[in-house]
Amino acid sequence: MSTKKWILTIIAAILLPVLIFAIVCLTRINMKVGDYEYSPELPKPGIGVDFGYDDLFGDLYVRWCNLLDNTQTALWKAPAGITKQSVSIPARDGFSIPCYVIVPAGHEDEKLPTMLYCHGGAFFLTMMTCQLDAASVYAEELQCRVVLPQYRISFDAPYPTPLYDCYDTLKAIAADPKTDADHVLIYGDSAGGCLAASVTQLCCDEGLLAPAAQMLIYPVTDNKDTYPDLTKFEHAAWPHKGNTRMWKRYLNGQDVTGSDYAVPMLHETLSDLPKTYVEVAEVDILCDQGAAYAEKMLQAGVDVTLQSVPGAYHGYDGDVHNTFVRRMLDTRIAWLGSVLP
């Protein structure tokens, strides 16, 4: 075979799988995401590939997204007045948990209130730059340190590993002399909200420390498939099919009960939980279950603030410069500020 034919064969061997992958992804785009009534102050959620396909192509798409997100977060530059640090925290099984630490510039070595930020992403997606953006806003406005663990994703290590990575990060925060131990905040969005809720339960049950507060943003709280919003908004920004796959990968066939920490709604003892803020997006399959967890905590005697955001969708707060988003960030900051010195 001539050199030219060899080159063409190699190019075809490379491009053909890429082309097949692209075509399959195009057939899986959620075209119905724009069918709902969103706030006119927010950009409509963009169409994207449905994460609900649990097969080879679905896995490849997730890996591709994670590769891009990991690259972007590594290259992310902190805004003026903020320092971004990279640290590693030992996990209980010997793994080193990579973490980003976002802190007000000039205060890196001071004792500060500290937030554990459990990022969202269906337990199988890695951290995104929008979460670093939000962490920077909190660090600046609250003059606190924000620690974001890059916990192992469920594709590689299902429950309980992602939870324990976050909890072991909280243990390191508690042991750090630069932490104001009386003002530790636990925060999470989406699946990170599930992790944050479970970390808070575990922390209170084991007596690690007394968190000043927990903040759960459009959180995953239950694996039941009976909430009306799961059908009402099944094709919205976070689709029902993706939610089903999320739980399948996270639990990995494990039978969960109220005695463990996989599903916040199943946990039986909630009365010792700290002051809590739960935010739900109105146009979101997770709206009902977030409100249900808030109600369960209220019934247990927990001081709970439930904030419903009209016209908002799952992940609506990705652009911290949007006026609608900034208004909600200010609401969160005001609430968090009420529990800090």
Please place each PLM-identified region on the residue numbering:
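General helical structural elements
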Residues: 8-9, 67, 336
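A domain-start/cap signature at the N-terminus of enzymes
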Residues: 73-87
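Alpha/beta-hydrolase superfamily serine-hydrolase fold, recognizing
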Residues: 22-36, 42, 48-64, 83-341
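N-terminal Sec-pathway targeting helices
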Residues: 1-19
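Beta-strand-enriched cores of mature, soluble protein domains
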Residues: 57-58, 68-72
